[in-house]
C-alpha cells in the first residue's frame, strides 16, 4: 500500500475517532475569513477547550460513514472546518455563533450533538444555553434560596423581639 493511502487512512481514523468521542461537533464554512480573523477564532475556540481543524471533505465523508453519521455528508461541500468538543456541549456552538455574529464570512452549516445531527437553527438555540458551570450555579442559587429566606426571616423575628424588649 502506498504511503499516501496509509496517511489518508490514518486521517480518516482520526476524524472517525473525534466524531465518535466528541460530545459536540460543529461544521462551518470559513471562506472569506482573513488570516487574522481565523487566528482569532482558533484562539477563542482553544480557550473554550474546543479543537478546530480543517479536513478534506472526502476524508471527512468516509469517517462520517464509518461511524454511521452519513447524514452529515450533505453539509460537507466547499471549504469546511470542524470544531470538536469532548467536554462541553455548548462551548463550540456558543463561540462559533458569537464569532459569526461579528464576522458574516463565517457560516455555521450543521453539527452533531451527542451523536444526533442538528441544523443551523438548533446550533443557534444551543448557543443561547448557559454553560454547564452556569447551569450548576443557577441550580445552587435555587437550592440556597429557601435556606437564605429562612435565615433572613429568623433574623428579622429576632431583631423585632429585641426592639420590643428594649
Swiss-Prot record:
* Gene Ontology MF term list: large ribosomal subunit rRNA binding; structural constituent of ribosome
User: PROSITE patterns, per this entry?
Assistant: RIBOSOMAL_L10 (PS01109)
Q: What is one process in the GO biological process aspect for this record?
A: translation
Check the record and name the Pfam families matching this protein. Ribosomal_L10
Q: Which GO terms describe its cellular component?
A: large ribosomal subunit
For this protein, the record's CDD domains field holds: Ribosomal_L10
Its domain of life reads Bacteria
Q: Is RNA-binding included in the keywords of this UniProt record?
A: yes
Q: Does the keyword Ribosomal protein apply?
A: yes
**Assembly with partners or alone:** Part of the ribosomal stalk of the 50S ribosomal subunit. The N-terminus interacts with L11 and the large rRNA to form the base of the stalk. The C-terminus forms an elongated spine to which L12 dimers bind in a sequential fashion forming a multimeric L10(L12)X complex.
Q: What does this protein do?
A: Forms part of the ribosomal stalk, playing a central role in the interaction of the ribosome with GTP-bound translation factors.
Record-given protein name: Large ribosomal subunit protein uL10
Species whose genome carries this gene:
Bacillus cytotoxicus (strain DSM 22905 / CIP 110041 / 391-98 / NVH 391-98)
Amino acid at each position: 500500500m502506498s504511503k499516501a493511502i496509509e496517511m489518508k487512512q490514518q486521517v480518516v481514523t482520526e476524524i472517525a475517532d473525534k466524531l465518535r468521542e466528541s460530545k459536540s461537533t460543529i461544521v462551518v464554512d470559513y471562506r472569506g475569513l482573513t488570516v487574522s480573523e481565523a487566528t482569532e477564532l482558533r484562539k477563542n475556540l482553544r480557550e473554550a477547550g474546543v479543537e478546530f481543524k480543517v479536513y478534506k471533505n472526502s476524508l471527512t465523508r468516509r469517517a462520517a460513514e464509518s461511524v454511521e453519521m452519513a447524514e452529515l455528508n450533505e453539509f460537507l461541500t466547499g471549504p469546511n472546518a470542524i470544531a470538536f468538543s469532548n467536554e462541553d456541549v455548548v462551548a463550540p456552538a456558543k463561540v462559533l455563533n458569537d464569532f459569526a455574529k461579528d464576522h458574516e464570512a463565517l457560516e455555521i452549516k450543521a453539527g452533531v450533538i451527542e451523536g444526533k445531527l442538528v441544523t443551523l437553527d438548533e446550533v443557534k438555540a444551543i448557543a443561547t444555553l448557559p454553560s454547564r458551570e452556569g447551569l450548576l450555579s443557577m441550580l445552587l442559587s435555587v437550592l440556597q434560596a429557601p435556606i437564605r429566606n429562612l435565615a433572613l426571616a429568623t433574623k428579622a423575628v429576632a431583631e423585632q423581639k429585641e426592639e420590643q424588649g428594649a
